[in-house]
Amino acid sequence: MAVAHGPVATSSPEQNGAVPSEATKKDQNLTRGNWGNQIEFVLTSVGYAVGLGNVWRFPYLCYRNGGGAFMFPYFIMLVFCGIPLFFMELSFGQFASQGCLGVWRISPMFKGVGYGMMVVSTYIGIYYNVVICIAFYYFFSSMTHVLPWAYCNNPWNTPDCAGVLDASNLTNGSRPTALSGNLSHLFNYTLQRTSPSEEYWRLYVLKLSDDIGDFGEVRLPLLGCLGVSWVVVFLCLIRGVKSSGKVVYFTATFPYVVLTILFVRGVTLEGAFTGIMYYLTPKWDKILEAKVWGDAASQIFYSLGCAWGGLITMASYNKFHNNCYRDSVIISITNCATSVYAGFVIFSILGFMANHLGVDVSRVADHGPGLAFVAYPEALTLLPISPLWSLLFFFMLILLGLGTQFCLLETLVTAIVDEVGNEWILQKKTYVTLGVAVAGFLLGIPLTSQAGIYWLLLMDNYAASFSLVVISCIMCVSIMYIYGHRNYFQDIQMMLGFPPPLFFQICWRFVSPTIIFFILIFTVIQYRPITYNHYQYPGWAVAIGFLMALSSVICIPLYALFQLCRTDGDTLLQRLKNATKPSRDWGPALLEHRTGRYAPTTTPSPEDGFEVQPLHPDKAQIPIVGSNGSSRLQDSRI
């Protein structure tokens, strides 16, 4: 995507992303903190964007929507919606050096968008860590000579269990071996029954109840693993981005090592090529279906983490002149390339399993928890040294989940700290992190009950679905049309040394909002009542799901009304104008960067359409302002 940057205004070397050593201290936010280096930010953002959905959702969508033909609408949506929205959120957070609440000094009436992002991140953070805890449980269960879901001779198995491997049918009692010959008859028989991996998942790990309202007992092994996962997340964030930035060197890179190991092992198996061809073979007639384009747009939108608040938060710890345009392109492409790569890993193993059973790949393909905890583990039992491959697979899932969970927790903590906005809360940030982690653990306990998986899927389907689309659409409109696209383009030029490329300007103003609106319409049209296997959710549960979805969106009009009521003005129109006008403390956080219309003055700047924070002309001071409007001035330590 070669697009000219346009005319470059007067800029220093640091404005192009390279901060010279003598200017490094001047570009650091000593009060709030920055990333140790830019690699930490890129790796953290990759870990945030590349999550479980890349492994268990994209490959399934690809083969269901035309195989290789799905790649065409997928990458079209990446270019015209994914990367532009990613760049917008990164530049938004980096320019203001504030989290998802503080950035709305740009237009205080829309601060409800930030609260909506917090609500979404809260929901996702609660259930996402439960998925990680289940991966921990499977990881620990894999530390054995024989995987516990390989056979049907366990206490929890039922007479309906029928597995590919069975100790009673082995020809060699000293070593587990696969049944010889064409196993299609066995698989057809199994279709009428249940696999050992499914019974292990449903009857042993979950002890699944019959109804979402029947919580039964809390599964203590899962509760323990949930505690482990929250402790790991807290320890990695104990010093904020300073500590998590070091952890991501491992958590963001090692999954690629595991993916590569599994890929090499997978493609050497008999039947792997068939699985990969099933994944990639294009069905070009599919691209004429609106559903395929809708799935492509939705997958791009959700997999990049747009409108969660995490991108704004992570970028807020960048140095002011960091080249976030470059970063957004790199991270977005890495995320999508990982999805495609994961598809090879998944379908090579599933192809091997289908070949072993003598059935079509579609009979063993699945997505979501069904892929991660039933289908793929079942396939791994067919491999020699299966516990080793199982350990690697679930360790990869744990790391992928943690990378996203770090940013979800940091989003909430940063929003709280920025909102209070005083030195005391900055000093107590570790305790804020601990408090949020403990609250997340307590709220996740019901999801470890016997009905927990029902609630987890309910939250996944409703809490972070169409609400994200609404939030993102309103964010685009408020920045481009309320604050003004010219103002925002000037802000980016001031920060990067060049304005956003013309392509991005067009996408932000017209193309991306249109695509977002299309996703919203598609989501509504394609809505189907949620089910889990053959279980139909009752109406009251679906109603709770819609309430969760609305709880984030409703923050936007409620806060807008609140802001209108507290804003001065003789008429409603005057109040509306004042409530949408940038606050006096909007702009770069550091005094050194407040140039042009943000330069410290003792009088308003009416020609720019909004006022800037007055600063004492004789003494360098940094405005320390809570996003609730309270402010104080602190002597600059720079």
UniProtKB/Swiss-Prot annotation:
Residue numbers on the Extracellular membrane side: 141-217
Region (Disordered): 1-30
Membrane topology according to the record: Multi-pass membrane protein
An annotated GO BP: neurotransmitter uptake
Matching Pfam families: SNF
GO terms, molecular function: amino acid:sodium symporter activity; glycine transmembrane transporter activity; glycine:sodium symporter activity
The reaction(s) this protein catalyses: glycine(out) + chloride(out) + 2 Na(+)(out) = glycine(in) + chloride(in) + 2 Na(+)(in)
Positions of disulphide bridges: none
One GO cellular component, as annotated: lateral plasma membrane
Compartments, as annotated in UniProt: Cell membrane
Modified residues (Phosphothreonine): 603
Residues annotated as transmembrane: 41-61, 68-88, 120-140, 218-238, 247-267, 292-312, 339-359, 382-402, 438-458, 462-482, 502-522, 542-562
Sorted UniProt keywords: Amino-acid transport, Cell membrane, Glycoprotein, Membrane, Neurotransmitter transport, Phosphoprotein, Symport, Transmembrane, Transmembrane helix, Transport
Main location: membrane
Modified residues (Phosphoserine): 605, 630
Essential for interaction with EXOC1: annotated segments: 627-638
Function in brief: Sodium- and chloride-dependent glycine transporter. Essential for regulating glycine concentrations at inhibitory glycinergic synapses.
Family indicated by similarity: Belongs to the sodium:neurotransmitter symporter (SNF) (TC 2.A.22) family. SLC6A9 subfamily.
Protein name as catalogued: Sodium- and chloride-dependent glycine transporter 1
Native organism: Rattus norvegicus (Rat)
Lineage of the species this protein comes from: Eukaryota, Metazoa, Chordata, Craniata, Vertebrata
